[in-house]
């Protein structure tokens, strides 16, 4: 039970004493009203889809094709471009009509969802159990809850397969690693080798290992979606046709608030993973649309100055910097030739504009002298001046502030927002998990307002 300072407060004809919930717990009204809760869910989905459609059209109306996508404060169009819509070689946007269509479709969908939300909130039955038993439920009905879990898993699995179908059969997806600087490509041979796909999960998250954030080719990304989509669909079928085993019945708390806590915990974890993925990965999040990663901007600057000074006659292989280490090139701890200077800390960076210049032992001196292409120079110069950093001084060798006035990288935005949201979801998970466990144990921890020590203390004034 939540505890108010004023236990007699009545809001909307409901008080804390008779309902067990304080006035701010608005959703508590719907705990046992499955029809009204359905209305709230559908209306919430409508609001989400409306935002997506409206923001999509807002970004389309402000989009300037001549400027890089990451320079325009866009967070939705890069996702659509990554799916291969309206994109040409090198990540150039050649058609914005698919983006307009996406926005309109989302707006139309939001209207349908909004109507459904209003209907079920105001007109439809308060509870579904009597009229529509298939859609009705009781929170403690363990079998029904796992059925609902199953339906959710199947929908998630189909969502994963949608990406697979788009990549393999419906025009392909944008691949930043395509020769010549990236292009839309049909993925004809996705990775289905379980050792490769699940190998990412057992990799270290540190350094160049990078856990799942280290995925660096579209074949593995699409193959991973084949695996996850198939497993989720099979898991969904399993949960629909089976009942929870005895150990699961004992281990879990079976209440609405417990399910809320499980969901918040899962979303929190996904938020943290999305934070790392959008910050570090330049394959699932191509730099042509999202801007360079931090290490990528730093390596770009080292590359740009190497190109400039090499043209001016510098011997980039032997020139020393102020510390006595190589000014342009040096060796990594394991012997590879890497860029020198502050960017040495990012020596394990991999990017499609740099990899053609590598040999069997790191950067290839002969290629650096003879094989650098104009598109690599242009891209490095662009990335150098668009670091996803907000420092007043240099970070990783990149002079951030001078070159980044009024520039916020989509990577900065996505990483920071997902970290903050993931953190808040995680705190919500802890809060609701604690309440659910306490309720299941027969007590809810709170401050006893009648015996609170402060009530007997002398007033401050």
Swiss-Prot record:
Function (record text): One of the components of the core complex of photosystem II (PSII). It binds chlorophyll and helps catalyze the primary light-induced photochemical processes of PSII. PSII is a light-driven water:plastoquinone oxidoreductase, using light energy to abstract electrons from H(2)O, generating O(2) and a proton gradient subsequently used for ATP formation.
- A single Gene Ontology CC term: photosystem II
- UniProt cross-references to InterPro entries, sorted A to Z: PS_antenna-like (IPR000932), PS_II_antenna-like_sf (IPR036001), PSII_PsbC (IPR005869), PSII_PsbC_sf (IPR044900)
The UniProt record gives the binding positions of [CaMn4O5] cluster as 355
One GO biological process term is:
photosynthetic electron transport in photosystem II
Listed name of the protein:
Photosystem II CP43 reaction center protein
Q: Does the keyword Membrane apply?
A: yes
Q: Could you describe the post-translational modifications of this protein?
A: Phosphorylated in vitro.
- Primary subcellular site in the record, as a coarse category: plastid
* Chain segments annotated as transmembrane: 57-81, 122-143, 166-188, 243-263, 279-300, 435-459
**Gene it is expressed from:** psbC
Classify the protein's membrane topology as the record does.
Answer: Multi-pass membrane protein
Q: Where in the cell is it found?
A: Plastid, Chloroplast thylakoid membrane
Q: Which residues form the propeptide?
A: 1-2
